[in-house]
Amino acid sequence: MKVAENQKVYDITIIGGGPTGLFTAFYGGMRQASVKIIESLPQLGGQLSALYPEKYIYDVAGFPKVRAQELVDNLKEQMKKFDPTVCLEEAVDTLEKQADGIFKLVTNKQTHYSKSVIITAGNGAFQPRRLELEGTAKYEKKNLHYFVDDMNKFAGKRVVVFGGGDSAVDWTMMLEPIAEKVTIVHRRDKFRAHEHSVENLMNSRAEVSTPYVPVELIGDDKIEQVVLQHVKTEEKVIIDVDDVIVNYGFVSSLGPIKNWGLDIQKNSILVNSKMETNIPGIYAAGDICTYEGKVKLIACGFGEAPTAVNNAKAYFDPNAKLQPMHSSSMF
C-alpha cells in the first residue's frame, strides 16, 4: 500500500460533519468500522450549527420540535459511544483511488487514507460573505462574528447586526431580550425576511437603521465603534458597540468535489439505490446526493446514512452481512 508510515487506514472516512455525517459516523460504529469525519468548518453540525442553531426544526421523526443545536448535540452524544476521529477546519482538495484500492484524501492540512468514503457534504463547502472593509480581518475571532454558537455571550452587550435577510432578522430578534441594545443595519429600506418576522422586528425594542451601510470599524484590539453611512444622503453616524454580527449570507460550492471524477447532476452527486456513486467504494448521502425522486430533508439523510454505511461495509469487507442486527439487540 502506498500509505505514509504510521498512517492509519480507516474503514470509512466521512466528508462533511453535518447532521447526516454525524449519524453516518454513529452507524459506522454500529457496524464496527473505524470512522473518521473531515469537516471544513470550525465545528460539527453543518448549517444547523453555523446558520441557525437556535431555530426549531419540526420535521425530524420522534421530535414534535427540536432546536437545531440540540439536535446536533444529541447526534454528537450518540456517535461518541464509538469515538470516531474528527478533523475540523480541513477541506478535502483531492480524492483518488490508488492502485491498491485504498482511497487517498488530501486536505489543506494533511493526507488521509481510507478503505471507503461517504460524502455527506450538504450543499458543499460554504463560507460566509465577509464584510469588505479595510482591517476587518484583525477583528475576526474577537468581536466580529460570522458564526454565532452561543447567544449567552451577548448578554448585556451592545450588538450590531449587519444584514437584511431572514438570518439577520432572526438573530436580531433572538438577541433583543438578552442584549443591552441590538441594532440591525440594512442597506435597503425594506428587509428581505419573511413579512411576519419583519413585523415582529418593527414592534420590538431593537433599533432599525435603514438604508445604511457600514463604512468603517474603529478600535484597536477590538471593534469599539461602527461608522454607518446613509445610502442616499451619505450622512454618517457613529455607533458604540461591544460586538458585531455579519449576516450577509453564505456562498456554497461543490468546489474540488467536481474534480473527483464523480457523476454530477445539477450540483449534486448521482447515486444508485445503494447510495453508491459511479466510483466503487465512494458513497454519498444527504443533500449532496441525488437520485430519481430525491427529497432534500434532514429526515431523508438520516435514512440514507445506514444504506451508505451497510453497503460500504460490504464493499471493504465482502464477508460482512449487508443486513445488520437491530440496534435493540446490540446494546
Swiss-Prot record:
Q: Which cofactor does it need?
A: FAD
Indicate which residues the UniProt annotation says bind FAD.
T20, E39, Q47, Y52, V92, F126, D287, S328
Keywords, in A-Z order: FAD, Flavoprotein, NADP, Oxidoreductase
| Co-factor note (free text) | Binds 1 FAD per subunit.
State one molecular function term (GO): flavin adenine dinucleotide binding
On subunit structure and binding partners, the annotation says: Homodimer.
The protein's name is: Ferredoxin--NADP reductase
Q: Which organism is it from?
A: Bacillus cereus (strain ATCC 14579 / DSM 31 / CCUG 7414 / JCM 2152 / NBRC 15305 / NCIMB 9373 / NCTC 2599 / NRRL B-3711)
